[in-house]
Amino acid sequence: MLELNEIHHVAQETSDVGAFYTGRNWTTQGNVLRWNYIHDLGAMGAVGTMGIYLDDCDSGDRLVGNVFYRAGRAAFIGGGRDNLVENNLMIECDAAVHLDARGTTRIKLDAAPSDSWNLLAKAERLDYKKPPWSTRYPKLASIMDEEPLLPLGNVVRRNVAYRCKRWLSANGMDKYLDRIEFSDNLEDVDDPGFLDAAKQDFRLREDSAVLKLPGWERIPIEKVGLYKDEYRAD
């Protein structure tokens, strides 16, 4: 669980990086990134930066209730499976959500076990078909039976995009978009009902259209970031 963090003004002199990053492994599952405020990221190079970067077929993670402001491609799923992007605010980002199908050309199931793109070999080193892996992550245990190269099982639900350049960046996904679950997203809302967007106060007014989304859960923005306690000098 990675929650209630404020990450800002990072990646000012680099590219192909995220405020949060993980990648190239089917087994790094179960991470929950919740209630983080990610903003004002750098944007160098052709690839740029990502808010939360699930790179190279990373799978089985949950991105819930985060606020992205000027955070490149905010929620980035690079060919992975069974990821959840839910209840997030994406504001003035290059793209609210990114999806691609890189696994169809990059995963090498018959390569040497030491090859970083042999994702099956990485899973086999952990006996992924046996408990505790198989009981905790049953979709991982059955991955080889369900078109393992494809970006299946991803859910993009109840997200809000405001003044983003694009709602969706979907490189090479023409054949697979209908296998992604999209539901109850506000893809380009005119007025989300922020208290004061000009001052980056992204709390929602009581009359906000966002609050009418089925199942919308309040994001505790006021709790995000540093706080004073007995261990903090200043």
Question: Whereabouts are the PLM-identified features?
Answer:
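Acidic, glycine- and Ser/Thr-rich low-complexity intrinsically disordered tracts
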Residues: C93, H98-D234
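Short, contiguous acidic/charged loop-to-helix segments that flank catalytic cores in large enzymes
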Residues: G23-N25, Y53-D55, R73-I77, I143-L150
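Short glycine/acidic-rich loop motifs that flank beta-strands on beta-rich extracellular proteins
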Residues: E6-I7, A11-G18, G42-M50, A71-G80, ...
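Short Cys/His-rich Zn2+-coordinating modules
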Residues: V17-G18, Y69-R70, Y137-S142
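Right-handed parallel beta-helix
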Residues: M1-Q12, R24-A46, G51-D55, S59-G72, R81-A95, ...
